[in-house]
Amino acid sequence: MRVVLALAALACAAACQPAATPTAEPAKPVSNIPAQPEGLSPSIPEILAASTAGEWRVIDPENTLYMEFPEGRVIIELAPDFAPNHVANVKALAREGYFKSGAVTRVQDNYVAQWAQAADPERLPKVGQKTLKAEFTRPRDTNIGFDVLPDPDTYAPEVGFSNSFPAARDASSMWLTHCYGTVGVGRDNEPDSGGGTELYAIIGQSPRGLDRNITVLGRVVQGIELLSSLPRGTAELGFYEKPEQYHRYTDIRVAADVPAAERTDLQTLRTDSESFAKLVNTRRWRKDAFYHVPQGRIGLCNINVPVRAAQ
């Protein structure tokens, strides 16, 4: 009887509870990407040709690095909104000449190209710092633009672009993501063991598992092929076995310090622009002479933000 009464009491307790207030569904990301277009997709060259001058942003020379190889120039745009201390430190290192006669010391297939002050890796900087506190994420801030993509992402609640950089965010924080061309800070196992004396660029399929585990400070906007086409290292993790195999560059300089006549002035399409929204949509709903089945969605790292010579 006690068992029956106990069961009855439990049943009554469950039945007599007041109805729970329906849980509101989380707000969906607000995106300016339009719905499925009718007919064939416009081409990216057509979209860019119709863009206006105001839809392009000049890449600031003060936040640009030139990595000078005999074969050409790799240009890196820095992201002070997301890694202000590392950006400042890398510029200080460049200005003190720390990077002169450096080299690419690691090229791991489908992963990264990494470079350092190879002539004397243990030499301490004179002005810049060897290590800094990690800047894996930053607090979410409505004053920093974030152009949301409408499609779900495996690694983050929301993804999109912040000032033309691929980025992600959750309820409290924001961070830059590891897409092709992303530039990050090499470190050891300890989170605060890097500072910018060693840097890397992603040259393969996007290793998004690195997000929020390494400080990201920029992206390659021109010349990535000079890194991605280098011979692969044969030692562990793609390092070159011998210094003779290193691929050397003459220097890394802040573009603002380079005479105007020697600069490569660039513009990037604003990711809050109507033309960029059209560009994303033409890739989400790609339908042309070759593509017959549009997917209706796109991954963050499958979108390349256009860059052009300054006009």
Regions found by a protein language model. Name each.
Residues M1-A9:
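Sec-dependent signal peptide recognition
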Residues C16-Q311:
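Cyclophilin-like peptidyl-prolyl cis-trans isomerases
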